[in-house]
Amino acid sequence: MKLRLLVMLVLMIGANVATRADGVLAAQNRELLEHIAAVHGYTPQQMDEVRALVLGSGYMGQGNPAITVHADTRAACTARLANAAIDYRNADFENICGAKYMAPLYDPAHENAAQARACIDQFEFPNIPCEYPVVWVKASEAAQVCTALGKRLCDAHEWEGACDGAVQAPDYRFDLAEGMAMGAAVARMRAAHNQAHGRQASWSYGPQFKRGACAQDGRKSASCAGGGYTQCGSNTYPTGDFPTCRSPLGVYDLNGNAAEHMNLPLNAEQMASTGSRVLGVTEMKGSWFIFDTYRAHPDWCRWRAPFWHGGRVMDAHSHANYHLGFRCCKTVGTGGLPAPSP
């Protein structure tokens, strides 16, 4: 009897802690949504759609507030940038992209920024300097948030070009995916891609991996042996906290802070960059906040990852975790693209 009472007491305490954490997360998300609306000037309809996605998720946010300990504060980030006279606003980029804090995607070898056909968020969502990236977001939710804001999820080659400083023609080996299951298709395509680009490996900030250049000197929670919501804090930095973590095209935090969802097409009809409503499979790009001390996997710009927790981008059960966020792309001159098909 005493044991039963003790178990019930423990369960009640755990439930109360979870309820309080849920309440804090919702409050943090409401504050974040207000900040997004104020900075970006999205329409009420756009914000209603994003609000429904964020508040309806139950997990999406800037980390589990019960355990997350961010590596730096928003105030310290803001003060540091002000002291260095750094302002991330770029009027030329805004004219080209039609939005704040986006960078044109192009190949400087034969194009200029004004000829870009797409743009990418300069920071991880919410795409606001000195704000923490949103994590615990499924790939399907990320795609829907981007669509609600008149943007879209980036294709893998767009992210790679933004990082490496030149968006080249897509080189997906769709022929290697024909007739294959998703996992096998990804394995064959990535092997060919990584072999083709591995000799020219580079990072967003230069040709060699460099500690201290990006937001990657953080620490995992002591209880984080796997990836559970209650064990792993999203101990990220504010975005833009490291001005040196900048690609040649003016995009920040592609290495470190939070890894990012991207769309990996397995055939030409799954390319978001060409206007397709049917997306491909999930791919994780970049790296996250512990890479100065523990490099969990390669993170050079054009490296393509294994099919970790893989599935269709629009699968309602697509993967989410404590160090995985996203950023959006935008096809220039279209005012957005149709919503992706589930």
Cite the ranges covered by each PLM segment.
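Sec-dependent signal peptide recognition
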Residues: 2-8
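Functional-site microenvironments in short loops/helix caps that host divalent-cation chemistry
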Residues: 152-295, 299-300
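A short glycine-rich, aromatic-capped structural motif
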Residues: 41-43, 47-157, 163, 256
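Disulfide-stabilized, aromatic/cysteine-rich ligand-recognition loop
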Residues: 21-38, 133-140, 147-152, 163, ...
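Extracellular/periplasmic catalytic domains that process cell-envelope and extracellular macromolecules
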Residues: 95-98, 105-115, 119, 145-146, ...
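Acidic glycine-/aspartate-rich tracts in secreted/extracellular proteins
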Residues: 124-126, 264-266, 333-335
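Hydrophobic h-region of N-terminal signal peptides that target proteins for export
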Residues: 10-18
